[in-house]
């Protein structure tokens, strides 16, 4: 019985971390575009969220969550964020991943680049297209080149632009 509590704790910790990480990004999108119909079925959005959920759930549990527990984190996080059936959204995301959906994979790649840049683990980061674009925009606006501001610009140039293009 103690083992079950351990798994529950990891799922809870992972879900809390996943929701806390993505909520400000979703909030920014809702502020600018409302909550577009179909956002919780959009391949790019789901890929971006799944990768973000995975990253923060693994960080929060020190890598001790995977498999079905991670799937439960996805379902719980989607339920909390969307007020819809998170398990259904997770099944769709799983299908998109299995089908190698190009938009889903782009969302995953963008979220991975942002997460790795934040952790300073992105290989050849100066030449990564999203980082380079964010730095060019920051320089053009004469903004600070602090890492946190580059991360914010990366989110705008990837997730926010994608939402605007699809739903704006």
Give the residues covered by each predicted segment:
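Helix-driven interaction modules
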Residues: 80-168
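Short runs of predominantly hydrophobic/aromatic residues within well-ordered alpha helices
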Residues: 15-18, 37, 41-49, 71, ...
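Charged, low-complexity surface segments at secondary-structure and domain boundaries
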Residues: 55-61, 74-78, 136-139
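Short N-terminal edge-element motif at the start of the domain
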Residues: 1-37
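Short, mixed-charge aromatic SLiMs
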Residues: 67-85
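Non-catalytic effector/regulatory segments
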Residues: 20, 30, 42, 81-85
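N-terminal interaction modules that seed assembly of large macromolecular complexes
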Residues: 24-67
């Amino acid at each position: 019985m103690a083992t079950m509590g351990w798994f529950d704790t990891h799922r809870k910790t992972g879900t809390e971390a996943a929701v806390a990480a993505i909520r400000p990004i979703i909030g920014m999108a809702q502020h600018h575009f409302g909550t577009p119909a179909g956002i919780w079925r959009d391949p790019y959005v789901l890929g971006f969220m799944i990768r973000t959920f995975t990253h923060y759930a693994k960080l929060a549990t020190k890598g001790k969550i995977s498999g079905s527990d991670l799937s439960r984190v996805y379902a719980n996080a989607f339920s909390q964020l969307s007020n819809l059936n998170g398990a259904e959204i997770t099944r769709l995301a799983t299908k998109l991943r299995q089908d190698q959906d190009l938009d889903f994979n782009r969302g995953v790649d963008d979220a991975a680049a942002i997460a790795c840049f934040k952790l300073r683990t992105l290989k050849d980061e100066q030449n990564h297209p999203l980082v380079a674009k964010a730095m060019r925009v920051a320089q053009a606006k004469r903004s600070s080149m602090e890492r946190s501001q580059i991360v914010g610009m990366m989110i705008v140039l990837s997730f926010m632009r994608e939402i605007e293009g699809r739903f704006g």
